Design a protein with these regions (language model features):
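Extended active-site and interfacial segments that coordinate phosphate-rich ligands
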Residues: 19-43, 219-221
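Trp/Phe/Arg-rich N-terminal binding region typifying the photolyase-homology
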Residues: 3, 21, 25-26, 56-57
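Extended, charge-enriched "interface" segments that sit outside catalytic cores
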Residues: 50-230
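An acidic- and aromatic-residue-enriched active-site/binding cleft used to recognize and process polar
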Residues: 6-8, 20-22, 204-209
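Extended, Lys/Arg-enriched charged tracts that mediate electrostatic binding to polyanionic substrates
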Residues: 1-3, 180
Length: 230
């Protein structure tokens, strides 16, 4: 199953639907789905308090947990929770990149003063103009400090497949260590959502008046010296 829509792409007879309209529509869609993922991963983070004293984990999960900036002594023996913390931090930076055009790539971390972003309330805030769709817990911590955050940033995802692969690392570890019951439910539902929505939520159908298509084809044919008067 994949989702599709025409909002932002219906230019057939509507001069007010422009390239900027399409860009806004696609951006808002991505903001919505990234916020959804952040909330779901935060829920998993809260629920997966498995201790290494009771349950083993794979080496891949241990490596992911080690990359988390969550260094609390209360969670040092909870690799699954710290792994979800790491995943959430990457999603947050992906959302910031989308809104600020500030891509960090791998290996960067958020400044300590914004660390509480990852532990606060996950309620969302949506404004009427469609440009402030960002969780309150991000918005409150980053307000007025984005210039500094550009220097010390969270890691980010290149695409939804990379996000899914991180989730699969956790799923596979659970399956390998008698955690089948924990795989069903929220984790499986999140994996299904990633398959359906990716980082774009839905494709956008493009509709355009036939005269515009004709003019575009004519220009292409003329520039390629195929037909000068299409």
């Amino acid at each position: 199953i994949t989702m599709g829509m025409w909002i932002g792409g219906d230019r057939d007879g509507n001069p007010f639907v422009t390239a900027e309209t399409l860009k806004l529509s696609a951006t808002v869609q991505s903001e919505v789905i990234l916020n959804y993922y952040i909330d779901k991963v935060y829920t998993l983070y809260r629920n997966f308090s498995l201790s290494t004293n009771l349950s083993k984990t794979s080496e891949a999960v241990a490596k992911m947990a080690a990359l988390s900036s969550d260094k609390s002594v209360y969670r040092e023996n909870e690799p699954y929770r710290r792994a979800f913390h790491y995943i959430q931090s990457k999603l947050i930076q992906t959302l910031l990149y989308l809104k600020e055009g500030n891509f960090s790539g791998e290996g960067h971390r958020l400044a300590d003063k914004a660390e509480a972003v990852l532990h606060a309330n996950s309620a969302t805030s949506v404004s009427h103009n469609g440009r402030e769709i960002i969780p309150n817990y991000i918005q409150s911590k980053l307000s007025g400090s984005l210039d500094e955050l550009r220097k010390e940033q969270l890691p980010s995802y290149k695409d939804a497949q990379e996000f899914k692969e991180d989730l699969l690392v956790i799923r596979d570890s659970l399956l390998e260590h008698n955690g089948q019951a924990l795989v069903t439910g929220e984790l499986t539902e999140l994996l299904q959502a990633v398959d359906i929505f990716g980082f774009f939520l839905a494709s956008i159908d493009m509709r355009q008046d036939s005269s515009v298509h004709e003019a575009c084809v004519a220009e292409l044919l003329a520039s390629a010296n195929i037909v000068k008067d299409y």
